[in-house]
């Protein structure tokens, strides 16, 4: 399906010169003088090579037909990450380079969206927010409650994040999966 370059978003799959690319970032740039352009960073799915392309915002780009399905994460091994389709119970192995930076956030039975192209997983989409436990942080210091400074913390998946001073070890917090940033204390 052909679309204009300015409508391409992160996570889209593009078919360029017979090869599939997953969009890592897409930015529309409107200079004061000249033609607006779309700066798109992509990763080739077949071998993981990253490229950066610039298109006029009105250029036509071929977007590959992919189907998004919900999958539950089962386990990881040396071959890759194993998922199960929620409807058909069919299992699918996804290579490590496709999962990429999403790997630390995968936990047993977590539901994710996998983009499937011709029977092969080409991209993964995590839930926007996920609940994790703080396993290491500095102790709470009295009198710090008025300041809005954040302190470093290590979460149960090994990701480092910045948390407010009142958060201690063992506290469950909600973080954004995109960058690991603190959202709120978990309500459970």
Curated annotation (Swiss-Prot):
One biological-process term from Gene Ontology? peptide biosynthetic process
Q: Which GO terms describe its cellular component?
A: cytoplasm
Q: In which pathway does it act?
A: Protein biosynthesis; polypeptide chain elongation
Q: Where are the transmembrane segments?
A: none
Which SUPFAM superfamilies does the UniProt entry name for this protein?
Nucleic acid-binding proteins, Translation proteins SH3-like domain
Record keywords, A-Z? Cytoplasm, Elongation factor, Protein biosynthesis
Give the source's domain of life in one word. Answer: Bacteria
Location within or outside the cell? Cytoplasm
Which InterPro entries is this protein grouped with? Elong-fact-P_C, NA-bd_OB-fold, Rib_uL2_dom2, Transl_elong_fac_P/YeiP, Transl_elong_KOW-like, Transl_elong_P/YeiP_cen, Transl_elongation_fac_P, Translation_prot_SH3-like_sf
An MF annotation (GO) of this entry: translation elongation factor activity
Output the HAMAP family linked to this UniProt entry: EF_P
| The family this protein is said to belong to | Belongs to the elongation factor P family.
Q: Which PANTHER family match?
A: ELONGATION FACTOR P, TRANSLATION ELONGATION FACTOR KOW-LIKE DOMAIN-CONTAINING PROTEIN
**NCBIfam families on file:** efp (TIGR00038), PRK00529.1 (NF001810)
What biological function has been recorded for the protein in this entry? Involved in peptide bond synthesis. Stimulates efficient translation and peptide-bond synthesis on native or reconstituted 70S ribosomes in vitro. Probably functions indirectly by altering the affinity of the ribosome for aminoacyl-tRNA, thus increasing their reactivity as acceptors for peptidyl transferase.
Under what name is this protein listed?
Elongation factor P
Q: Which organism is it from?
A: Afipia carboxidovorans (strain ATCC 49405 / DSM 1227 / KCTC 32145 / OM5)
Primary gene name? efp
